[in-house]
């Protein structure tokens, strides 16, 4: 298990960047944290760590955003989903089979879709600026 305390959004992004630079294709990063905790900032850093220059935004309404480049990042926001069945309905298994890194916000809503090999990232808001980031699971922890 790895733990960090960040004092700004850019520091949160830097942790995501550091993690993603080492992730093999096909990794699933399950993100947990309340509204405004910094999940999207973390994914923005992940994209940068994967060499992607795309503008990363939360896919709350589209549910899925795909970022293509030297490596592929698929960004899910499960806030509006009520269970894993809905994730499978939008093609979860197809996304997994592409070998892309999948970052899943609001993972608590779809935990039954995971196979136990995901990397779990919990972001807790300590203050307006500070976040505690806990990373566990997967081959890197």
Regions found by a protein language model. Name each.
Residues 1-18:
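N-terminal pre-Walker A segment at the start of P-loop NTPase domains
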Residues 2-3, 48, 82-141:
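Short phosphate-coordinating micro-motif centered on Lys-Gly-acidic
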Residues 20-25:
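Phosphate-binding P-loop
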Residues 29-31:
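Hydrophobic anchor at the beta1->P-loop junction of P-loop NTPases
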Residues 34:
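P-loop (Walker A) phosphate-binding loop of NTP-binding proteins
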Residues 39:
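Conserved lysine of the Walker
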Residues 52-67:
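Short beta-strand-centered segment that lines the nucleotide-binding/catalytic pocket of NTP-utilizing
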């Amino acid at each position: 298990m790895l733990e960090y305390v960040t004092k700004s959004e850019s520091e949160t992004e830097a942790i995501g960047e550091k993690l993603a630079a080492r992730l093999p294709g096909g990794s699933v990063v399950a993100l947990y944290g309340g509204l405004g905790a910094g999940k999207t900032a973390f994914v923005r850093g992940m994209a940068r760590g994967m060499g992607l220059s795309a503008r990363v935004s939360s896919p709350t309404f589209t549910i899925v955003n795909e970022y293509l480049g030297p490596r592929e990042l698929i960004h899910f926001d499960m806030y509006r989903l009520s269970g894993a069945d809905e994730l499978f309905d939008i093609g979860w298994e197809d996304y997994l089979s592409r070998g892309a890194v999948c970052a899943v916000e609001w993972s608590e809503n779809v935990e039954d879709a995971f196979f136990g090999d995901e990397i779990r990232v919990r972001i807790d808001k300590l203050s307006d600026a500070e976040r505690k980031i806990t990373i566990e699971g997967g081959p890197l922890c």
